[in-house]
Amino acid sequence: MTHLSKEAVIVRSALEAKGLETPMQHSSLSAQEKKQQIEQHMTSIMTLLGLDLADDSLAETPHRIAKMYVDEIFSGLDYGSFPKITLIENKMGTDEMIKVQDIGLTSTCEHHFVTIDGKATVAYIPKDKIIGLSKINRIVNFFAKRPQVQERLTQQILVALQVLLGTDNVAITVTATHYCVKSRGVMDASSQTTTTALGGVFKSSAATRHEFLSRA
């Protein structure tokens, strides 16, 4: 059984309490067992599509997809891979906005399993704790590495940072291109979707909200 960090447990519990957790079922399968079963199913799917898996270009594709799903693009389904979080006391008394802009993220649309490609901007006003800057990027990418809808992704990042930092004063905006819109259906290659999640003073103060959004 995978040992979960204290931070992973409190973040997961907070998301469950707010109804913001990704719809998931508990699985007792190991990562290797998941990969084996996914590989088998992908072999069946590709065969049904009429692809020749005896061809050397396709022979390893089911294995590659299985490994990619479990170890890479859906690794955020496993809280055992939640990033190690570094927090320090706010001894400097910082009480102004800290913002990390243009955090690159790649996720997967849970409706069609195609790419969501975009950027996030994250800001918070410290209370008692300050988080290592790279940890913000890692938290964004942890939640991106799941089948997602952008609205939930944005809220998950917000709640995770709020509980870790011990403050409601957190703000997130995500702007992304959805390949379920770009590469199929309406096939609109130019549109982007922006979602915002605001907490604490970012929600209650028009001036603080404007400061965040005007530079997001």
Swiss-Prot record:
<keyword id="KW-0862">Zinc</keyword>
<dbReference type="GO" id="GO:0005525">
    <property type="term" value="F:GTP binding"/>
</dbReference>
<dbReference type="GO" id="GO:0008270">
    <property type="term" value="F:zinc ion binding"/>
</dbReference>
<protein>
    <recommendedName>
        <fullName>GTP cyclohydrolase 1</fullName>
        <ecNumber>3.5.4.16</ecNumber>
    </recommendedName>
</protein>
<dbReference type="InterPro" id="IPR001474">
    <property type="entry name" value="GTP_CycHdrlase_I"/>
</dbReference>
<dbReference type="GO" id="GO:0006730">
    <property type="term" value="P:one-carbon metabolic process"/>
</dbReference>
<dbReference type="InterPro" id="IPR043133">
    <property type="entry name" value="GTP-CH-I_C/QueF"/>
</dbReference>
<dbReference type="GO" id="GO:0003934">
    <property type="term" value="F:GTP cyclohydrolase I activity"/>
</dbReference>
<dbReference type="GO" id="GO:0046654">
    <property type="term" value="P:tetrahydrofolate biosynthetic process"/>
</dbReference>
<keyword id="KW-0479">Metal-binding</keyword>
<keyword id="KW-0547">Nucleotide-binding</keyword>
<dbReference type="GO" id="GO:0005737">
    <property type="term" value="C:cytoplasm"/>
</dbReference>
<dbReference type="InterPro" id="IPR018234">
    <property type="entry name" value="GTP_CycHdrlase_I_CS"/>
</dbReference>
<comment type="pathway">
    <text>Cofactor biosynthesis; 7,8-dihydroneopterin triphosphate biosynthesis; 7,8-dihydroneopterin triphosphate from GTP: step 1/1.</text>
</comment>
<keyword id="KW-0378">Hydrolase</keyword>
<keyword id="KW-0342">GTP-binding</keyword>
<keyword id="KW-0554">One-carbon metabolism</keyword>
<feature type="binding site">
    <location>
        <position position="112"/>
    </location>
    <ligand>
        <name>Zn(2+)</name>
    </ligand>
</feature>
<dbReference type="Pfam" id="PF01227">
    <property type="entry name" value="GTP_cyclohydroI"/>
</dbReference>
<dbReference type="GO" id="GO:0006729">
    <property type="term" value="P:tetrahydrobiopterin biosynthetic process"/>
</dbReference>
<comment type="similarity">
    <text>Belongs to the GTP cyclohydrolase I family.</text>
</comment>
<feature type="binding site">
    <location>
        <position position="109"/>
    </location>
    <ligand>
        <name>Zn(2+)</name>
    </ligand>
</feature>
<dbReference type="InterPro" id="IPR020602">
    <property type="entry name" value="GTP_CycHdrlase_I_dom"/>
</dbReference>
<comment type="subunit">
    <text>Homomer.</text>
</comment>
<feature type="binding site">
    <location>
        <position position="180"/>
    </location>
    <ligand>
        <name>Zn(2+)</name>
    </ligand>
</feature>
<dbReference type="InterPro" id="IPR043134">
    <property type="entry name" value="GTP-CH-I_N"/>
</dbReference>
